Amino acid sequence: FNEAEHVEQVIAQADVILVEPVMQPDYTKARDERKGETGLTPANYKITRELLTGKAKSDAILLHSLPRMDEIPTDVDITRWSRYWQEAFNGVVMRMALLALVLGAME
């Protein structure tokens, strides 16, 4: 565990990069109703394609619980580091299995 002022200071050491939104939007409102109330991620916490390409280990993985805001740009989605889509899919399967177990559909 490391604490740093800028992700750039520690990303080269990371095997797993877990990103979460700094500010949570009000999901009860449509985007056009929010009028910029979403809050922006400080630049020193954003994970960009350039940062990953220039500093991250080639075998590091990038996780995010989704939905994302501006902390990870969409051009990172197609890089070798992104694993958040698989993470989201696996989360659905795990929740289905837990519900089946709790409701007695399986032993």
Predicted regions and their residues:
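Rossmann-like adenosine-cofactor binding region
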Residues: 1-76
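Adenosine-phosphate binding glycine-rich loop
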Residues: 57-107
